[in-house]
């Protein structure tokens, strides 16, 4: 993850990541029912997260609905995934191939066909479970967003769901921004995607602080 390098508020020490937004650290609190992770989000941050997660869920639902109906699924109830690679670049980032050989550029057509067949079989078998996990994490993030006072309190399970969902949001934004590892720390002033990049950095630090809170003892 890129380092926390945003402008700090002199009064609170919070890190500003995009116009009107501050990343506030998470506080770990031990309770009789296990650890809780507390923070505060502003109303416009809640609205932003709802918008981003809604778009993510739309993509995942669209992918699931593209799976062909399988006779065995009707009989067994076991879902089969779409065997084809997603055409949408964002979905390709979220649901990459299961196997990519290091020497793929040097393989002959027959070997490439074998790799494609393997990935198709793995997608059909495992993609439904992956989509369900991503959707569940995204829905948990939505369900735990505050409605009024901005105060967040997450269980350990919810915190892990937030980390997974925020990571998927970063992957999706990374496609728009054409970000490859490692991500740049800034884009030129006036760049048409500068606001998207600021949101990407905000999500990165939000995720980083929550990971640190989970790792704290």
Swiss-Prot record:
<dbReference type="Pfam" id="PF09438">
    <property type="entry name" value="DUF2017"/>
</dbReference>
<feature type="short sequence motif" description="CXXXC">
    <location>
        <begin position="5"/>
        <end position="9"/>
    </location>
</feature>
<keyword id="KW-0676">Redox-active center</keyword>
<dbReference type="InterPro" id="IPR018561">
    <property type="entry name" value="AosR"/>
</dbReference>
<keyword id="KW-0805">Transcription regulation</keyword>
<protein>
    <recommendedName>
        <fullName>Putative oxidative stress regulator AosR</fullName>
    </recommendedName>
</protein>
<keyword id="KW-0346">Stress response</keyword>
<comment type="similarity">
    <text>Belongs to the AosR family.</text>
</comment>
<keyword id="KW-1015">Disulfide bond</keyword>
<keyword id="KW-0804">Transcription</keyword>
<feature type="disulfide bond" description="Redox-active">
    <location>
        <begin position="5"/>
        <end position="9"/>
    </location>
</feature>
């Amino acid at each position: 993850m890129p380092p926390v390098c945003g402008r700090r508020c002199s009064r609170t020490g919070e890190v500003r990541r995009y116009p009107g937004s501050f990343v506030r650290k998470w506080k770990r609190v031990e309770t009789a029912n296990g650890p809780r992770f507390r923070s505060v989000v502003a109303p416009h941050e809640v609205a932003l997260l709802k918008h981003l997660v809604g778009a993510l869920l739309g993509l995942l639902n669209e992918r699931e609905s593209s799976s062909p109906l399988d006779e065995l699924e009707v009989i067994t109830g076991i879902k089969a995934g779409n065997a084809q690679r997603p055409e949408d670049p964002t979905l390709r980032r979220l649901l990459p191939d299961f196997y990519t050989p290091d020497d793929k550029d040097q393989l002959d057509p027959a070997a490439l066909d074998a790799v494609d067949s393997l990935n198709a079989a793995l997608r059909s078998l495992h993609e439904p479970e992956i989509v369900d996990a991503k959707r569940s994490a995204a829905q948990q993030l939505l369900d735990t967003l505050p409605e009024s006072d901005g105060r967040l309190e997450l269980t350990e399970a919810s915190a892990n769901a937030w980390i997974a969902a925020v990571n998927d949001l970063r992957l999706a934004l990374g496609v728009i921004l054409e970000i490859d590892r490692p991500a740049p720390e800034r884009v030129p002033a006036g760049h048409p995607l500068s606001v998207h990049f600021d949101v990407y950095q905000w999500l990165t630090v939000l995720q980083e602080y929550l990971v640190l809170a989970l790792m704290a003892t």
